[in-house]
Design a protein with these regions (language model features):
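Structured alpha/beta or helical-core interaction and ligand-binding surfaces enriched in interleaved
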Residues: 1-135
Length: 135
């Protein structure tokens, strides 16, 4: 994802249901990181949101340089440095009461560890889909 910005104020989006339907038609399981496919399917069943992008996150270290791997980080004394590639999920949220409650719940997730968990907008997503947020 590109430029993260502070969360924007939701706006009315009369095309939400059509966009949600179009998105579900275009969703390809092969493009979703295997460990989170079922979670993404469940989220997309909610009537007030749909996912735009997601990434499970990937560990890179000496001996594992595949930036698309889904392998868990092994327990090993030989690994001295790990690069963790960002994990995120981006949603489009409907401008209704359920959507607003969902958005408020997402914002609260950052209280788990606000140093590493962020709630934001991604400018590149908002430009093509209003009411898009990432965590």
């Amino acid at each position: 994802m590109e430029t993260f910005t502070s969360p924007k104020t939701m706006v009315e989006n009369p095309q939400f249901q059509l966009q949600k339907q179009r998105n579900s038609n275009d969703l390809e399981n092969a493009a979703i990181d295997a460990p989170i496919i079922e979670h993404i399917k469940h989220v997309n069943q909610l009537p007030y949101c749909f996912t735009l992008q997601c990434c499970h996150g990937h560990f890179l270290y000496n001996g594992q340089q595949d930036s698309q791997n889904n392998d868990p980080l092994p327990i090993s004394d030989s690994i001295s440095k790990v690069e963790y590639r960002i994990a995120y999920i981006a949603f489009c949220v409907d401008f209704n009461d359920q959507g607003k409650l969902f958005l408020d719940s997402l914002k609260q997730i950052t209280s788990i560890d606000n140093k590493y968990i962020k709630f934001c907008c991604a400018e590149c997503l908002w430009e093509r889909q209003v009411n898009s947020y990432a965590i």
